[in-house]
């Protein structure tokens, strides 16, 4: 389940990056 957790974290980070672009 560790791999799945890492995948979810990575997806969450990408999701945040898409809607919160750097200034």
Swiss-Prot record:
GO BP annotations, alphabetical order: amylin receptor signaling pathway
Source taxon at top rank: Eukaryota
Gene Ontology cellular-component annotations: extracellular region
Major localization listed first in the record, in broad terms: secreted
Gene3D superfamilies: 6.10.250.2190
GO molecular function: hormone activity; receptor ligand activity
Compartments reported by the entry: Secreted
Keyword Secreted: yes
Keyword annotations of the record: Amyloid, Hormone, Secreted
Protein's UniProt keywords contain Lipid biosynthesis: no
UniProt comment concerning the protein's domains: The mature protein is largely unstructured in the absence of a cognate ligand.
Family: Belongs to the calcitonin family.
Self-association state and partner proteins as the record states: Can form homodimers. Interacts with IDE and INS. Interaction with INS inhibits homodimerization and fibril formation.
Physiological role: Amylin/IAPP is a glucoregulatory peptide hormone that plays an important role in the regulation of energy homeostasis. Selectively inhibits insulin-stimulated glucose utilization and glycogen deposition in muscle, while not affecting adipocyte glucose metabolism. IAPP function is mediated by the CALCR-RAMPs (AMYRs) receptor complexes. Amylin can also bind CALCR receptor in the absence of RAMPs, although it is more selective for AMYRs.
Protein name: Islet amyloid polypeptide
């Amino acid at each position: 389940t560790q791999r799945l957790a890492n995948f979810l974290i990575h997806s969450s980070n990408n999701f945040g990056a898409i809607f919160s672009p750097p200034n």
